[in-house]
Amino acid sequence: MKSTATPRFWQLLNALPADVQALAEKNYRLWAEDPQHPSLHFKRLAGSGHRFSVRVGDHYRAIGWKVADGGVEWVWIGSHAEYDLLLKRR
């Protein structure tokens, strides 16, 4: 699956610990080959037709928007605790 990432996504990713960055890279490659791989938990966010989340290990998540060409634009990555707060705000 094709994807892009926003400058903000890269900023957030680069602020994460090196081991989390490496895991995000590994999971991205897996997602690009098989978005439905069970370990990724790639899923549409509740109440949203175009927002998706993907697992980055047990403690981190990334959020992306479905774009016109069918790909995903990654917009956010952070801890699961921050992810939970974001979902409560919507």
Predicted regions located by residue number:
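Arg/Lys-rich, positively charged N-terminal/basic patches that mediate binding to nucleic acids
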Residues: 1-27
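Enriched for short, Lys/Arg-rich terminal
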Residues: 2-4, 56-90
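Tryptophan-centered motif/residue detector
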Residues: 10, 28-31, 74-76
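Residue-level signal for pocket-adjacent positions within structured domains
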Residues: 11, 35-40, 78-81
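Hydrophobic residues in alpha-helical membrane-spanning segments
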Residues: 18, 36-39, 63
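Short, charge- and proline-biased low-complexity linear segments
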Residues: 25-27, 45-48, 80-81, 85
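A short, surface-exposed loop/turn module that caps and links secondary-structure elements
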Residues: 29-54
